Amino acid sequence: MIRVICNNETYELPQGTTAADFASKIKNSHYFAGVVINDQIKDLSTTLNEGDTLRFVTFTDPEGREIFLHTSAHILAQAILRLWPDAIPTIGPVIDQGFYYDFANLSISEDDFLMIENMMGQIAEEKFAVQKKTFNSKHEALEEFARNPFKVELIKELPEGESITAYSQGEFMDLCRGPHLPSTGPVKAFKLLRTSAAYWRGDPQRESLVRIYGVAFPTTKELKEHLHQLKEAKKRDHRVLGMKLDLFSQQECSAGMPFFHPRGMIIWDALIGYWKRLHQLAGYKEIQTPQLMSRSLWEVSGHWSNYRENMYTLKIEDEDYAIKPMNCPGCMLYYKTRLHSYKQFPLRIAEIGHVHRYEVSGALSGLMRVRAFHQDDAHVFLTPEQVEEETLNILHLVSELYSTFGLEYHLELSTRPEKATIGSDELWELATAALERALVNSHTPFIINPGDGAFYGPKIDIHVKDAIQRTWQCGTIQLDMFLPERFELEYTNAQGEKSTPVMLHRALFGSIERFLGILIEHFKGRFPLWLSPEHIRVITVADRHQPRAQKLATAWQKLGFVVTVDDSNESVSKKIRNAQNMQVNYMVTLGDREIEQNTLAIRTRDNRVLNDMTEDKFLNTLLEEKNSLSLTPLL
């Protein structure tokens, strides 16, 4: 007999019991996609051992969803080979929005999707058992996949002695690490989304491939809900709204580096202004460090040896330089310009730094995935005893910031990775426990992500949920046990001795460009007044009303409002439509009556009409709406 732990309970099981055997004794086990054993995701066919700790996962769990989609990708490949036997499958990973599979020697269009989906449905209905095969040698694996040059290339690159596995379902077999569903049966609903060109391993010099994207779900209902969400997301696409609302553009000459227009800069300045006020009140001091620094700095930080392929480098007077991909090393140098005492701690240093990181062109996407962006970093230097309290302070700051934008969020605590190289076991345990206690005391829901911490310390990731329930990883709080030591940072402790400070590295927006993209989609371009690129548009009925309109606009601009005047020759109704299409918060129509009675005719972008309003009431209400950072209009 062996003993295993599941859901904090101990079970005695016969030797040789598999996770599937054990699962069969649990209610609703047919929903299980896989099992996490000792923090590693496994197939249900895995044999259990003495002392194993296990947790079964379903489609609603991130691990279970990945298994489900991975098997769905194999079903797609099997369907393609049934319909186009000469196609050559290459790789088919799970991605955020579903999965894709790349094929060589295949020519299809979206007109073929229905036929492919029907074949996928047939494969699912056949309920093939998904079986794992472990090859005895690299030679055996090469023989199995000898007709597929892409698989052969992957196998040859594997280190000698590494386990090589494949998964089969019916007549189809694919080189794969797994894990997978026990059978093709649970995959009930498919939808192929689009096809595109791709290159083997993302290299334009290599073979051209056809990439097919898809999604899959356990039920048709879930698929329909997802497709509705995709339709809504398309309406909110920040790339489309960004151009329509004249916020930003992208140019071929600078892929991944957006151009912000005047209207976009108004939103940008509002975001940054809010961030600065928030941090000043929280006791942060702001710095600015250079974008270009020499190789010697990046060697000390470890970036030159570990991150150089993602950095932009150049030579100046025969010396290597790099544009910074991260703000951290610059802050380390700032810290060293002064002597420090424990009495100054926590020392909170913030920077909105412009960083550059190389991304392949195929991965670029609007403001969400770029090569140049601004990151709102802060580095907090403190003693080990202050970690828990300061982490809690940061979590309170997180709550205040995201609630200001009406964004819900959840937190993930990532613990020590298996191959962590920095710090002792004891230090990792203390650091992780301090972060976990802070999370508990913040009363914010969180989950533990075992083994996903950085090599230099545990971290808390912040995942926000937008208006259509999509989640985005934005901010992070990381305990860094590496850089302070690497840069030989010191402070004088309470005993008068020199010590190395602990450092909390955190970003709240993360990439400000990405956060702005999220906000555009979250608000669907309909920004609250304090963030809006155009607060008020004054619309004249006739040319004779232009002087009064301009006088009002000038006065309101002095109060901090963004005001424009439309005195064009268009009809009043066309002017109103134009303003509403640009999501202007308030339109003020000015004609003879309004001038004679000294009143205003107000119209909101939701088409609410408020006639005969006094200027004082209008301005006082808008000032309250703007200054309170209200998410909803007060008129």
UniProtKB/Swiss-Prot annotation:
UniProt KW keywords: Aminoacyl-tRNA synthetase, ATP-binding, Cytoplasm, Ligase, Metal-binding, Nucleotide-binding, Protein biosynthesis, RNA-binding, tRNA-binding, Zinc
Region of interest (Catalytic), ranges: 237-528
PROSITE patterns xref list: AA_TRNA_LIGASE_II, TGS
InterPro entries membership: aa-tRNA-synt_IIb, aa-tRNA-synth_II, aa-tRNA-synth_II/BPL/LPL, Anticodon-bd, Anticodon-bd_dom_sf, Beta-grasp_dom_sf, Mopterin_synth/thiamin_S_b, TGS
The EC number(s) this enzyme carries: 6.1.1.3
Cystine pairs: none
SMART domains with a match to the protein in the record: tRNA_SAD
Cofactor requirements of the protein: Zn(2+)
Domain of life of the source: Bacteria
Keyword hit for GTP-binding: no
Top-level class of the enzyme under EC nomenclature: ligase
Record field: catalytic activity: tRNA(Thr) + L-threonine + ATP = L-threonyl-tRNA(Thr) + AMP + diphosphate + H(+)
SUPFAM superfamilies xrefs: Class II aaRS ABD-related, Class II aaRS and biotin synthetases, MoaD/ThiS, ThrRS/AlaRS common domain
Subcellular location: Cytoplasm
Molecular function as annotated in GO: ATP binding; metal ion binding; threonine-tRNA ligase activity; tRNA binding
Example of a GO biological process term: threonyl-tRNA aminoacylation
Residue ranges constituting the TGS domain according to the UniProt record: 1-58
Protein family membership: Belongs to the class-II aminoacyl-tRNA synthetase family.
Assembly, per entry: Homodimer.
NCBIfam families, alphabetized: thrS
Function statement: Catalyzes the attachment of threonine to tRNA(Thr) in a two-step reaction: L-threonine is first activated by ATP to form Thr-AMP and then transferred to the acceptor end of tRNA(Thr). Also edits incorrectly charged L-seryl-tRNA(Thr).
Name assigned to this protein: Threonine--tRNA ligase
Organism placement in taxonomy: Bacteria, Pseudomonadati, Chlamydiota, Chlamydiia, Chlamydiales
